[in-house]
C-alpha cells in the first residue's frame, strides 16, 4: 500500500476505536514509524457477523471480543486493532512482532503475541521484548499483530466499561 493510503487508512480505522484507546494506538504507530516501520491497521471495529465468521474459521477464539465493542446507538468503539507491518502483511518478521509488543506495552496496551502461551513461555517473551531479542527460539502467541486495551474484561467492555 502506498504511504498516503496507509496513513489515510490508519486515520480512518482510528475513528472506529474508543477515543482513549485510539490515542494509545496512534502513539504505538508513531513509535514504530520512528523506527522505519510502516504499520497498518488492518482491522479495528468488526461487526458481530464478521466476528462469528472469524470464530468459525479459527481466526478468533471468542464470539464477541474487543473488536466488537460499540457505544451509544451502535457507534463503533473498538478496543482492539490488528496492526500489520505494511511491508510484510502476510508474514511479519519476528523483529516487527517484538517491537510491536514493546510499543504496545509502553502505551498500556496488551499484545496478542502473548495469547495462548503458558506462563513459562510468557517470561521468555517478556524478556525478549525488554532486550529487543529477535531470536527465533522465542515462542510467540497465536495473534501477534493484535493489540488491545487493558484494565477490563471483554464482558465489562460489552457492558459499557471503557479504559481510562
Over which residues does each language-model region extend?
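Active-site acidic/histidine clusters and adjacent loop/turn architecture
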Residues: 1-43
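N-terminal-biased segments
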Residues: 1-3, 20, 43-46, 50-58, ...
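Residue-identity detector for glutamine
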Residues: 8-12, 35, 42, 51, ...
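Extended, low-complexity, intrinsically disordered C-terminal regulatory tails
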Residues: 29-61, 111
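An exposed tryptophan-centered "aromatic clamp" motif
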Residues: 64
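Catalytic cores and adjacent binding grooves of peptidoglycan-active enzymes
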Residues: 67-164
